[in-house]
Amino acid sequence: HNGAAALSDVTRRGGVAYTYSPWMRDYESGYSLHSLGSFYKINQRNAILLGLRYFGYPEMDGTGEGASGIHPKEIAVEAGYAYEVIKNFSVSATFKYLFSDMGRIGNSRGASSVAFDLGVLYKCEINDWEGAGWSVGLHVSNLGPKINYLTSKDALPATVKVGGAADLPFLQMHKLTLTADLGYRLS
């Protein structure tokens, strides 16, 4: 449930993060996910974010098997805005440009689309327990038109997720966070 709406809770003015994840290592090497994200808090109630994700596939030949110089990839560029409507209640919207290049397999060429994500987050402190709190959020992702390949149009994996979290401090510098999420794929 932690979409861009969670930025209203951040106390820093801005931040940048990079992650790398080798994907399906036990299945086949060559899959990787690179993510670069940043945010900037304009003021106490407004924040903007930028992100870039790159998913690389292993090198393939023209049939999708083995190596022969074809490098499929997926790229997403994101820009978003988060706003704290009232104390403890935030909303967010993220615009994404999506590009998919299956490496010129057959007669295909790269395909692109756009999508939107929407989120809401409510958080609350637990009375009589310093630093403790809970939150609940809703996130709807990949709302947008189908992605257009040369010979087909495929629906984006639109999803809706709801989740909650509880932060429970147990020592001065430590806390336990319990979370639960439920998701449903719309398309």
Predicted regions: what is each one?
Residues H1-S187:
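Subset of outer-membrane beta-barrel
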